[in-house]
Amino acid sequence: MAIDLRFVLAMLKINSNLERLGDFAEGIARFAINCKEPVLDGELLQKLRLEEMISQVLSMLELAKKALQEESQEMATAVFAKDNLLDEINANGTAVLADYIGKHSESALSCLNLVSVFRKLERSGDHITDRKNVV
């Protein structure tokens, strides 16, 4: 009976984290819809490692899901390394964007909004690792 209760409580926690991930995804989608720049600078996006960050978040989510399904502590532990990479990319992104704004002041608003996207991706990683702790 105690195991069943722990499982139910764990699922409630996971559900809460998944709801937050949905909120972050909605915020990122709103940025994409409302972005005033027709195309963001490709060189900037490469320096920011945005695609790598997005891929890491998706990979973390998939790995956490598999860890839960297979009750694998090893898989769950691997999620932490990916979160550390997200933290690194996020920290570097702020400096890159500050430098870019200094050189391209006309893109300041889009860049500031992009900081929010990075923060949402980084927080997504935090919520996924929190989900992992339940495994």
Regions found by a protein language model. Give the residues of each.
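Cytosolic, long alpha-helical scaffolding segments
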Residues: 1-135
